[in-house]
Amino acid sequence: MEPSSETGMDPPLSQETFEDLWSLLPDPLQTVTCRLDNLSEFPDYPLAADMTVLQEGLMGNAVPTVTSCAVPSTDDYAGKYGLQLDFQQNGTAKSVTCTYSPELNKLFCQLAKTCPLLVRVESPPPRGSILRATAVYKKSEHVAEVVKRCPHHERSVEPGEDAAPPSHLMRVEGNLQAYYMEDVNSGRHSVCVPYEGPQVGTECTTVLYNYMCNSSCMGGMNRRPILTIITLETPQGLLLGRRCFEVRVCACPGRDRRTEEDNYTKKRGLKPSGKRELAHPPSSEPPLPKKRLVVVDDDEEIFTLRIKGRSRYEMIKKLNDALELQESLDQQKVTIKCRKCRDEIKPKKGKKLLVKDEQPDSE
């Protein structure tokens, strides 16, 4: 008896039966071709902006390359988009927490205080561009080192309190899209934010930065001057513009700015702008030499007067001549009176009064 009759089940499918079933399935290539051909029946809808940028980046002929140098350049480069930086003018009062000196191209700020940076461009950069801020040492003997916070301030941050790594000097305030990077080749720290166009009625974009360590901290900057490099880059890392300025993190920004500006003007041979001299109107007459005689009696001191107008001069001259004549007459009267008094004096007991330069009679 056959097994099929005993169990009451159909025999298993053979290889020929499986091939017959597979041939009944539609061809996947033909299905995709039909679906692509059916796209012509739908109206043309524009792609999203993000998709357009993505296709341009993927289908472009030029392959973007990111340049990473051990010593970043500090030369200003506006680029074809005209990158410019501006700062708020806060003066040099003692109460300011952040002030910028255009003469020195230097920013003075306090620890962990807000430093508004105004970014301006002449034409909008490509979509998805970023602004990168990097701190480097200014002097050549220190430029190879990475700018970091001192161990004291680095340990003062509680884990999870700040999104930035504890060793990073710079922070971005009020922007949740900011992200912090460390270069794999040089180890330099940087903070990046997406570039956002100016708001309606404004000409610049504001980015709020913080410096989280003093310039005088031991183990950190250790009184070594630093520079901040602001670069405008594409999403692929291509440089579009660069600006640079010096930074000093101190306790009294206004005082330090005045001191450094005065020292700078002295080196250039100019007078500090702290005090202004009174402006005197120009005079056509040549200045007369000042004459002063050192005498004992105040009445014998000689003064020089500058008189405006010929008539006034003649009148005062006549008055002066009259006073001098009166003085000479008074002296003559005193001399005559003294002589008369001397002649009226008679010697006692018949003796002749001796006069000066007169010899006595010989006996």
From Swiss-Prot:
Which InterPro entries does the annotation name?
p53-like_TF_DNA-bd_sf, p53/RUNT-type_TF_DNA-bd_sf, p53_DNA-bd, p53_tetramer_sf, p53_tetrameristn, p53_transactivation_domain, p53_tumour_suppressor
Q: Where does Zn(2+) bind?
A: 150, 153, 213, 217
Q: Which GO terms describe its molecular function?
A: DNA-binding transcription factor activity, RNA polymerase II-specific; metal ion binding; molecular condensate scaffold activity; promoter-specific chromatin binding; RNA polymerase II cis-regulatory region sequence-specific DNA binding
Gene Ontology, cellular component aspect: cytoplasm; mitochondrion; nucleus
CDD domains for this protein: P53 (cd08367)
- According to the record, the residues making up region (Transcription activation (acidic)) are 1-29
Cofactor: binding details: Binds 1 zinc ion per subunit.
* Family annotation (Pfam families): P53, P53_TAD, P53_tetramer
Q: Where in the cell is it found?
A: Cytoplasm; Nucleus
Functional summary from the UniProt entry: Multifunctional transcription factor that induces cell cycle arrest, DNA repair or apoptosis upon binding to its target DNA sequence. Acts as a tumor suppressor in many tumor types; induces growth arrest or apoptosis depending on the physiological circumstances and cell type. Negatively regulates cell division by controlling expression of a set of genes required for this process. One of the activated genes is an inhibitor of cyclin-dependent kinases. Apoptosis induction seems to be mediated either by stimulation of BAX and FAS antigen expression, or by repression of Bcl-2 expression.
Name-wise, this protein is Cellular tumor antigen p53
